[in-house]
Every structure is written in structure tokens, then in C-alpha cells.
């Protein structure tokens, strides 16, 4: 609808037209500030230009039946859509059902490689991982809905010092809790009940002879054993959030290609030796300084592994590569992009989205840390507390790059202060009305819209605006727009519902048709957010 209006106006005016939503609904459904843009060109007041253009648009043959009114107001041109136009779009939308708002694959479709979560398999997923996980999953859903091809991948950091430290931590816990030895722990180690659980499970699962081997052998075996257990638990946690990956890439397997990658970096004159280390000349590409890839002891840095992994990704020739990282990785972006340039790739194809910190409260107090995981709040604990859908909604309700703080008790309330409940309640009200209605759904669908007042038309317009919201949410990586849209539409519906009777009016079927459109838009929006909308819900109010 938005695209059609924009196209018609640009054809008439032969200028690029920006379409906005007026802040005041009394000004219409759409507005354009084009008169301000043309004021300097024509050396006229925007007010005069707006009047001239409004007349040109309203009298043009292509807008007949499209608008009820085209009005110049303070330099803006405001448009009110005709009921006939809204009716045609409503009929088409209701026929499309769950495909309403989607786009077919086309020449504009992209092939997107989306990597997210990629948490080290050294512990359970905590709440800090959940935000990026939910965002990435919903972004993929929206991209596919818009006709793009998406591969979702989890990069498993299954080698290196952190994996050995995991094995060492389990070994020390085994000695303390199974062998009942007195153990001195190092300054840095993985702690929490989950480490003790793994140690006890290893005692049951692994051959007793293992624990008679030398310590390095024991630690190596326990590292792999614990890593596999944690990866299974991570997958279970993701499943509980409704998240499923297309592939899991092993750092250990990917890193087997390191020699070929380093050979290409050398040929590109990207490396040099200094202080017995091998450095990447990343400062040539906007990095703050050059970065070490191989340390004095000949071991590789984390960056080296990441470079090899990105080379493997870029070999697959996707249109766009999106990484979702924690905000603390901000300084890491330039060095990875530098390596891509040295390897002959276009680093502009890589977009890195940063997930800011999450702070959970309960009764206005910091949420209790998990004993099982030490100083972390586990995803599973919060899902058990408030449910998957509420957690997903709240994580998507703010821009990814802004800090998020919320009290989980809000998500348990059955009133308008709980946004997800308020939206479910709107849909529940609609389905309850349909059940009570003497009309069949087919009768309602076939009823033409001929007698709607301004408020009813605006509610219908809001429900029909979903496609543009989906599109802009994807283009701007602003998935919070989907949440805001659903909240606003639900609020508008509740206002409509509370304003007067719906079933006991001569135009009941027309009003029910609007309700069906609202329900469809709420349902499709929630589906893209990874939330199942409810058709039945109890209410205290």
C-alpha cells in the first residue's frame, strides 16, 4: 500500500517522494514534505508549492478513487485514503492470510549469511547471549518472509585455551567432589554447579582407566567431553527459545585451512614479524593498531581463528554477511574487516550488529544469579519464570544497540502494563466476538466495506500498514518497530472495542471484517517475532 502510493505520487510529480505518517491522525493517513525540498529549486514558499501540488495530485486521473482528500497544511501535503481503496487492500490481505506482508523472491532478493550467538561451549547460555539470539532468529524470519535467502550459522569455538581451561576446571572438580581430595584452584577457572555436575557425570560415563592416565591426557579428554555436553545444553536452551540453526561450524575443523589463508595474507604483504610475533597490518584499514596473529610461543590468537573462519564464509559468495556480537566486541570489527580486504574480499559486505547489555530486575531488585552457573542469569531460569514468548518480546522491544532493563514481574501482570498480555488480549477479544457472532466467517469476509467512520477507517489503515513496518524493520535492523506496531495496533483496537457495541449494530459484519484484519496483522507480526499469538486468554479487568 505504501509502495503503491509512493509510486503513483512519483509518477505524477516526476520527483522522488518521501512518504511519512502524520503525527496527528486527523491530518490523514499519509503525508509528504516534498514542498520543503522543492522550495529552493522553484524559489517559492513551501506553503505555496504544497497548495499547487495538492491541486495537481487531487485532480490527476491516477488518483481518482485513491484518496478521499489531498490537503496542503503548513507546507506538508496530507492524504486520506478512500474507503474503496482500503476495501480492495483488505480483501487482498485477508485472502493472503499468513502470507500478508510477505514478498516473493525477486531480482532484489539477497543471499544472506547470518552468524549469531556463537557463545563458547564452556558454560550454559546466560541472559547476555539471549538478546542476540532472539534478534538474529527474528531477523532471519523477517528476511525470509521478504523473499531473501538466509543461512543461520553458529560458530563453535571448540579449540584453544578456554576449552583446555574447561577441561582443567572439570578435572579439579572431579578430584575435589569425586575423589574427595583437597584441591587448590587457579586464579582463573570455570566455576558453578554445572562444572561439578559434569565431573560427576564423567565419573559415570568415562572409563575408570582414563583417570589413571597422566594429567594432560585426562584434561584433554575431559575438555572434549565437557565441550560436547555444553554444546548439547546450549542447543536445548536455544530450542527452548524457539531458535534453530541451519549449521554449526567447528573452529577446530575450520582452522585446518589456516596455512592456505596465511599464505594468501603473506602474498598480500599483510603480515610482518616483530618481537618474535607475527602481526597483521590492520592499521592500514582504519584499525587503531596492528594485531598479533601468532604469539611468541607459536600459538595462534583468537583473531587468527576468526580470520580463517571469515575466509571460509566469504568463499561461499553471499550477497551480505551479518554478524551479531556483544557490544564489548566493538573494537574487533576493524581488524576483521582489514583481514577481509587483505584476502581480496569486499569488507563492506560484512555488517556487524552489536547487542548491548541486558539488566534484569525482579520486584525492582537485581534478578537472582544462578547458583548453577556462578555469576550469571541463565536463559533457562528466565524462560521457566516468564515463558519463551514474553522473553522474546521484551528482548526485541528495544533497539539492539541500546541498553535494555526490565522487571520480569511486569511480564506476569494481566493488564495493559504488560505489553505482550495486552496484545494477546486484543486478539482474544476478537476471537471471542467471532464465536459469539451470528455470522459465519465466510459471511464476514464477503461483506463489502461501505459505511465506516474516520476512527474505524484509521484502525483498518493501521492493520493494513504491516507490510511497510516489516520492510523498514528489516532494512534498518530495527525489530523494535514490530513490537511497537503490535502494541499500537492492539491499543487502537481496545479503544475501538471499548467505544461501543460491535455485534449489535447494523454494520456488525463490516466491523467484524476490520477485526479479522487486525487479528491477521497481529498474528503475522508475532509469527515473525517468533511468538505464538493466543486466541483465548483470561482477563482480570
UniProtKB/Swiss-Prot annotation:
Its main location: cytoplasm. SMART domains: Arg_tRNA_synt_N (SM01016), DALR_1 (SM00836). It is found in: Cytoplasm. Its EC number is 6.1.1.19. One of its GO terms (biological process) is arginyl-tRNA aminoacylation. It catalyses: tRNA(Arg) + L-arginine + ATP = L-arginyl-tRNA(Arg) + AMP + diphosphate. Transmembrane segments: none annotated. Disulfide bonds: none annotated. This is Arginine--tRNA ligase. It comes from Helicobacter pylori (strain Shi470). The lineage of its organism: Bacteria, Pseudomonadati, Campylobacterota, Epsilonproteobacteria, Campylobacterales.
Amino acid at each position: 500500500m505504501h509502495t503503491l502510493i509512493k509510486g503513483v505520487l512519483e509518477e505524477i510529480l516526476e520527483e522522488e517522494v518521501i512518504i511519512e505518517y502524520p503525527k496527528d491522525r486527523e491530518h490523514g493517513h499519509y503525508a509528504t514534505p516534498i514542498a520543503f525540498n522543492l522550495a529552493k529549486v522553484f524559489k517559492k514558499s513551501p506553503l505555496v508549492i504544497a497548495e499547487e501540488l495538492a491541486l495537481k495530485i487531487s485532480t490527476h486521473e491516477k488518483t481518482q478513487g485513491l484518496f478521499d482528500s489531498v490537503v496542503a497544511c503548513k507546507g506538508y501535503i496530507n492524504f486520506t485514503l478512500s474507503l474503496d481503496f482500503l476495501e480492495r487492500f483488505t480483501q487482498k490481505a485477508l485472502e493472503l492470510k499468513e502470507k500478508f506482508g510477505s514478498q516473493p523472491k525477486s531480482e532484489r532478493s539477497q543471499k544472506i549469511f547470518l552468524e549469531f550467538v556463537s557463545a563458547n561451549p564452556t558454560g550454559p547460555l546466560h541472559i547476555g547471549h539471549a538478546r542476540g539470539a532472539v534478534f538474529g532468529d527474528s531477523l532471519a524470519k523477517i528476511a525470509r518472509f521478504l523473499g531473501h535467502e538466509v543461512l543461520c550459522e553458529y560458530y563453535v569455538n571448540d579449540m584453544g585455551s578456554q576449552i583446555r581451561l574447561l577441561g582443567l576446571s572439570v578435572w579439579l572438580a572431579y578430584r575435589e567432589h569425586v575423589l574427595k581430595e583437597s584441591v587448590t584452584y587457579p586464579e582463573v577457572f570455570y566455576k558453578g554447579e554445572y562444572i561439578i555436575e559434569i565431573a560427576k557425570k564423567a565419573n559415570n560415563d568415562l572409563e575408570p582407566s582414563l583417570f589413571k592416565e597422566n594429567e594432560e591426557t585426562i584434561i584433554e579428554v575431559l575438555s572434549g567431553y565437557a565441550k560436547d555436553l555444553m554444546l548439547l545444553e546450549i542447543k536445548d536452551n536455544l530450542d527452548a527459545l524457539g531458535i534453530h540453526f541451519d549449521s554449526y561450524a567447528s573452529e577446530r575443523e575450520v582452522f585446518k585451512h589456516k596455512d592456505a589463508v596465511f599464505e594468501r595474507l603473506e602474498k598480500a604483504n599483510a603480515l610482518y614479524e616483530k618481537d618474535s610475533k607475527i602481526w597483521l597490518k590492520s592499521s592500514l584499514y582504519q584499525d587503531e593498531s596492528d594485531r598479533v596473529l601468532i604469539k611468541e610461543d607459536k600459538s595462534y590468537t583468537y583473531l587468527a581463528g576468526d580470520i580463517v573462519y571469515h575466509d571460509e564464509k566469504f568463499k561461499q559468495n553471499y550477497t551480505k554477511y551479518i554478524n551479531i556480537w556483544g557490544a564489548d566486541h566493538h573494537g574487533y570489527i576493524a581488524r576483521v574487516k582489514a583481514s577481509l580486504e587483505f584476502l581480496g574480499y569486499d569488507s563492506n559486505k560484512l555488517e556487524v550488529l552489536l547487542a548491548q547489555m541486558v539488566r534484569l530486575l525482579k520486584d525492582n531488585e537485581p534478578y537472582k544469579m544462578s547458583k548453577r552457573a556462578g555469576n550469571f542469569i541463565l536463559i533457562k531460569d528466565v524462560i521457566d519464570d516468564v515463558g519463551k514468548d514474553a522473553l522474546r518480546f521484551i528482548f526485541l522491544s528495544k533497539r539492539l544497540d541500546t541498553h535494555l532493563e526490565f522487571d520480569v514481574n511486569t511480564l506476569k501482570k494481566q493488564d495493559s502494563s504488560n505489553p505482550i498480555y495486552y496484545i494477546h488480549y486484543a486478539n482474544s477479544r476478537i476471537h471471542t466476538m467471532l464465536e459469539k457472532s451470528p455470522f459465519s466467517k465466510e459471511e464476514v469476509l464477503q461483506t463489502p466495506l461501505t459505511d465506516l467512520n474516520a476512527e474505524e477507517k484509521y484502525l483498518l489503515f493501521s492493520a493494513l500498514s504491516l507490510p511497510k513496518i516489516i520492510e523498514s524493520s528489516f532494512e534498518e535492523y530495527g525489530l523494535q518497530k514490530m513490537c511497537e506496531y503490535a502494541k499500537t495496533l492492539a491499543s487502537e483496537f481496545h479503544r475501538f472495542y471499548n467505544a461501543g457495541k460491535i455485534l449489535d449494530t447494523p454494520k456488525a459484519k463490516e466491523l467484524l471484517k476490520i477485526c479479522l484484519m487486525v487479528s491477521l496483522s497481529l498474528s503475522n507480526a508475532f509469527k515473525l517475532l517468533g511468538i505464538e499469538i493466543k486466541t483465548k486468554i483470561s482477563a482480570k479487568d
